[in-house]
Amino acid sequence: YQKVSLSEDAKKYNWYSIENEAERKTLETPFYTVVFDENGMIARLYDKKNDREVLKPDQKGNRMVMYEDKPMCFDNWDIDMYYTEKGWEVSNLSRFEWTDLGPLCVSIELERTISNSLIRQTITFYADSAVIRFDTYVDWKEHQHLLKVHFPVDLHTDEATFDIQFGNLTRKIHQNTSWDEARFESCGQKWMDMSEGHYGVSLLNDCKYGHSAIDGVMTL
């Protein structure tokens, strides 16, 4: 924890701007231009410092999908590669609210439902950091269904790196061979990363360990 004291001038300083429209909401920070669509998904994430789009064209970030999960065996610990054939996008947004509009950060609170389950999420952007924080609470009440969040990043690379207990592991993100096709899921302790040259995107977490990066779509 860190205690930060702010002067009165700092408290009055607006380092962000918000534009609310019927079908989209736009947030401007020193690091990003962020556009949320009517379902609360990230329709655009523009990196100002590096002058580039983070997400693939016409694709959404923070996109949640519920997939049918009926593996051939090991029902509790196994995921079969065909699970993506039957999925439902979590698009039923019941709440979108700007909160914590202060000198240090701006937060958005989202609430979604799908079937019998509830998903609450707080997304935080900072005045002095390029980190985007997602605090996600899921009250999951489904049988033989799993939930994944997707971030389709616009990077020119054929591999992703995953944190493991004794270092890290690099795997291909294509399915050109049967061996690559079988590696549709990767374990990761605390992070995964996709990079090209001097630019990359990392997905960090503190409680989930199943990752995927097929065709450049980072999922958790």
Language-model regions, residue ranges each:
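C-terminal (or distal) subdomains of carbohydrate-active enzymes
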Residues: 1-220
